[in-house]
Amino acid sequence: MTEITAPQGKFENGKFYFPVRIYYEDTDAGGIVYYANYLKFAERARTEFIRALGVRQQDGLEAENQAGFVVRHCEIDYRAPAVLDDLLSVSCEVTEVGGASAVMHQEIRRGDDLLVTIDIKVVYVWLKSKRPSRIPPELKTRITGA
């Protein structure tokens, strides 16, 4: 059986970089990437960033006390469009970590061209109660040391 691997990101100069190829399904009637899809690309990069740190999000969902990160706030600035077949780089950098939250700065680039910037705040919550929880120390150490 052929082994299939997921797209790999990489750490470089304190940031995590994840590649995204633009497919026809990502574009709108005007032939450019539909604006909401940039949030999907950013989510994929954040997920792979956490995975690259050795953290499986599924473990938090299967634990007795289910917990995980949810988006609390997002600011996005669209500077230039991406189009079909572009290969983009989505970066993820932790800029602030609090007791129960973290702020990340993300950039989406095509080569050297900056297309989109995103600043996003995530909060660690108990999934059943939807209440904030302190980020576990071992997880906090991993995300601050990235």
Regions found by a protein language model. Give the residues of each.
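Catalytic strand-loop segment that frames the active site of acyl-thioester-processing enzymes
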Residues: T2-E48, A52
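HotDog/MaoC-like acyl-thioester-processing domains
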Residues: T2-K10, F16, P81-L84, T95-A146
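Residues that recognize and position ribonucleotide moieties
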Residues: F16, G31-I32, A67-F69, S133
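Hydrophobic residues in beta-strands and at strand termini
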Residues: V20-Y24, Y78, Y124
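Residue-level signal for pocket-adjacent positions within structured domains
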Residues: I22, E64-N65, K130
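Short alpha-helical segments used as structural interaction elements across diverse proteins
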Residues: N37, E43, F69, L127, ...
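Hydrophobic alpha-helical segments, especially transmembrane helices
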Residues: A45-T47, H73, R131
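Hydrophobic beta-strand-centered segment that forms part of the acyl-chain substrate-binding groove
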Residues: F49-S89, E93-E96, S101-A102, L115-T117, ...
